Amino acid sequence: MAIYELRTYTVTVGKMNDVIELYKTLGWPALSKHPNKLCSYFTGDIGALNQIIHLWKFDDEADRRAFWNGVFSDPEFMNFAKQLRPLLQNQENKLMLGAPWGPQV
């Protein structure tokens, strides 16, 4: 059964444009070298603001761990992460399973 990982990064107020530029120039190029497990990235428009939200889909927990182990061993991604961390206030991860009804991502 597929596992979904919802990651929510709360950005320091006034730093969203810096985070977006960092993702465009360093983050996404580094991530795109790895298997495509990303469903989508989102930013908030109403409700909680200053957040980058991303949804990932993995075959199972072993697939998830293998993916992140590969990403975290990538020097280009780790350079991006080093620059991203000071711009964030909080990081939250949720692991979810698809409901047994309705559409699946």
Q: Model-predicted segments: where are they?
A:
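Short glycine-/aliphatic-rich beta-strand segments at the starts of folded cytosolic domains
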Residues: 3-9
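Helix N-cap motif at beta-to-alpha junctions
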Residues: 13, 57-62
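Hydrophobic pocket/interface hotspot
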Residues: 7, 19, 31, 54, ...
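Short, flexible helix/strand-to-coil boundary loops that buttress conserved ligand/catalytic motifs
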Residues: 23, 68, 81
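Short amphipathic alpha-helical segments
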Residues: 15-40, 71-72
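Short, contiguous strand/loop micro-motifs
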Residues: 6, 14-15
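Short cationic/low-complexity microdomains
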Residues: 66-77
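Glycine-rich beta-strand-turn "strand-cap" elements at beta-sheet edges
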Residues: 1-2, 33-53, 59, 78-105
